[in-house]
Regions:
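Short glycine-cluster motifs
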Residues: 1-48
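A contiguous loop/helix-start segment that scaffolds small-molecule binding in enzyme catalytic cores
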Residues: 1-5, 9, 39-41, 49-171, ...
Length: 186
């Protein structure tokens, strides 16, 4: 839309590559959006507001798949979002996160469940400029991509004879990754 308008106005412009805030949110969460046996798909969407969404692309329809969801432009509708996610098929206790101003210096990560999205945002006065991430990939389980599994052969690496412990390696700073379901802010 912006490029079309600039062209109509006769203004010159350059299109620069960028990194979407949904990728920044994954980094903030220290999470992979896809994990074997948990979710191999990511749905990037938004709640219906003043601009309609096709019924087949509604939150409820996408929730039926229980894939990882990244939801834009919906922070002001979190009660309704929770209802739609639950009606669509996510259990109320499904892990969720609100990532406020992903990649900005004032970034804040709020971990919660689908059921308590609104309360979590209200407690931190988050009313806009946030992404909602939903899915079991946020559980903190020790599942990892097969690509990085020592027992998995790739084009660049042979599998090790001793696959070792599954899961993410320990962090050097000593911070434990095990309880990602707890509320947290940064």
């Amino acid at each position: 839309e912006q490029v079309d308008e600039l062209g109509r106005c006769g203004m010159s412009y350059a299109v620069c590559p960028w990194v979407s805030s949904f990728c920044g949110a994954a980094a903030a969460l220290e999470a992979e959006y896809t994990l074997p046996g948990i979710s191999q798909s990511v749905v990037i969407t938004r709640m219906e507001g003043r601009t309609p969404v096709p019924e087949k692309e509604s939150i409820r329809s996408f929730a039926a798949h229980q894939s990882t969801m990244v939801i834009f432009l919906s922070t002001g509708m979190l009660r309704r979002l929770s209802e739609e996610l639950i009606r669509g098929g996510y259990p109320a206790d499904t892990p969720a996160a609100i990532v406020y101003k992903a990649t900005w210096p004032e970034e804040k990560v709020l971990r919660c469940t689908v059921a308590d999205l609104a309360e979590t945002a209200e407690a931190e006065n988050v009313t806009k400029t946030a992404l909602i991430v939903v899915g079991r990939v946020l559980d903190g389980e020790d599942e990892r991509s097969r690509l990085y599994e020592p027992s998995f052969t790739t084009e660049l690496r042979k599998a090790s004879a001793d696959p070792g412990k599954r899961g993410r390696p320990a962090r050097e700073d000593g911070v434990r990754r095990t309880d990602r379901r707890a509320h947290s802010t940064r």
